Amino acid sequence: MPDLSGKTLFISGASRGIGLAIAKRAARDGANIAIAAKTTEPHPRLPGTIYTAAEEIESAGGKALPLIVDVRFEDQVQKAMDQTAEYFGGIDILIN
């Protein structure tokens, strides 16, 4: 796997599942992770929110930016990408 230290990943659906697993793996290399997901409140049957994911990513060694995004709405995606680029100085990798 390439070195992801200092790289910025924008990951949709990173609050749980495969998205979170990818984020935590990249965080171990020191990556910056923008967590783009809808989950801000705990679900009764599914673990994780964008905030708990951010904690896990930072515990793994990365930097996290939790963003409330519903990918069905282009304006929300564009706003989140703009926020990510401003916060981390750009976006290197997009995972949807």
Question: Residue locations for each model-derived region?
Answer:
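Conserved acidic residues
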Residues: 92
